[in-house]
Structures are given as structure tokens and as C-alpha cells.
Amino acid sequence: MLTVCWFLYLVRTADNALYTGITTDVGRRFLEHQTGKGAKALRGKGELSLAFSAPVGERSLALKMEYRIKQLTKRQKERLVAGDGSFEALYESLQTPPVKRD
């Protein structure tokens, strides 16, 4: 069975807001956002730019990462986009199985 790789991405709007999403094809999804066929949250937001994208693997992990990143402050998202290592740390924290407690 073919495994599909999911990506997490952040889009920057004209007013400098960051939108977080997941997809299996970043180029296609970004084009959908640019042409008004993507998320309603980005429609009418002016010029869009792809600020960040990274492969995360399976869909379940991509959904977890998307949720966690959407919980971050704008400053924390900006650091992630700048490549401060926070994406890698978050990725690793979600890869580690939970500790079983007695």
C-alpha cells in the first residue's frame, strides 16, 4: 500500500497574519488559496505568500501538529517560520510515545 506524505504549511497574508494548514500537495493547495478556492479564512486577504512548509508524514501526525501550531502565539509562529528549531522540537515531542504510568 502506498503511503501518502502529509505536509504542514503556513501562509502569510497581506496584513502579516499567519494561516496554518495541512495538505498532501503544498503547491496545489497554495494555488487554491491564491485563487480563492482554498480556506474561506484566506479569501479577500490580499496577496498571500507561503511562509513555511515541512513534511510531517502521516495524516494523524499532521493533524496533531496543525492543532498544536494553531495554539501558538503569533510570536511563537514567527520563530517557527524563522527556523529557530521549535518545529523540530514539536515534531519530536509528538513522535515520542506517551509515558506509561503505573
From Swiss-Prot:
Pfam family, one: GIY-YIG
Stretches assigned to the GIY-YIG domain: 4-79
InterPro entries in UniProt: GIY-YIG_endonuc (IPR000305), GIY-YIG_endonuc_sf (IPR035901), UPF0213_domain (IPR050190), UPF0213_GIY-YIG_endonuc (IPR022992)
Disulfide bond sites: none
Homology family: Belongs to the UPF0213 family.
Protein name, UniProt field: UPF0213 protein Ent638_3592
